[in-house]
Amino acid sequence: MLKRCWAGEVRNVSLLVAIAVNGEGYREILGICEGAKEDKAGWSAFLKHLKGRGLHGVRLIVSDACMGLAESAAEFFPEAAWQRCIVHWYRNVFSHVPSTKVREVAAMLKAIHAGEDLVAARQQAVRVIEKLRGLRLTTAAELVETAVEETLAYYAFPEEHWRRIRTNNPLERILREIRRRTRVVGAFPDGQSALNLAAARLRHIAGTAWSNKRYLNTELLKDQQMRGAITA
């Protein structure tokens, strides 16, 4: 979220950014655009733009609980699964937990995602819900019960990928770098100025080792698809 001047007032402006891992396993920056706010209309326009530029074969979309993005993704990339970032989800649960209980609850939540497979994770989630209710953390228990499934999509992918596809930490690091570079400006004269500076920073990142180092072994995906075809 950046600030820009509009009719003499300083207002917030959102920049929507998308990165991806390509078919060879390397990270790419797909695009950036200005959005008045992170709603479905803004994300739909952005995803439509990316799809129009040739984005296809999307298998998994990772984000925080941005319903505008989740809904738009289902419309433009219906074949893709949605993975809710477990880090953001943990923080959401912690917001309903007393500070004295956060460490205990954190261990409970991490135990869910330490499961060896989807079945084990679901079974652990049931136990966590019971424990939270036993601690009278009703709201936290309800959040786990209603939303934990959104954090388990990564189990459908190779185990070697799990740690890197269940959070949107790679994007968060990029956004922090953009905020660091733009903070010195304060309020931009217009949205385009903010967009230009952010895009320049993204181009710089794309030219570093960030995009030259293989992030995922995508051969594992091909092996998984082949095994599935044989089983079917």
Task: Locate predicted features.
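Conserved beta-strand -> loop -> alpha-helix junction used to position metal-binding or nucleic-acid-contacting
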Residues: 60-67, 72-108
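Flexible, active-site-adjacent loop/turn segments at secondary-structure boundaries
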Residues: 3, 19, 28-30, 53, ...
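Acidic/histidine-rich catalytic cores and adjacent linkers
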Residues: 115-232
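RNase H-like nuclease fold core
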Residues: 1-62, 67, 71, 76-79, ...
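Conserved, well-ordered core segments of regulatory domains
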Residues: 1-7, 64, 83-86, 144, ...
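A short, charged helix-loop
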Residues: 35, 104-108, 112, 116, ...
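Amphipathic alpha-helical transducer elements in NTP-driven molecular machines
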Residues: 12, 40-44, 63-70, 99-102, ...
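Hydrophobic/aromatic-lined pockets within catalytic cores
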Residues: 51, 55, 74-78, 94, ...
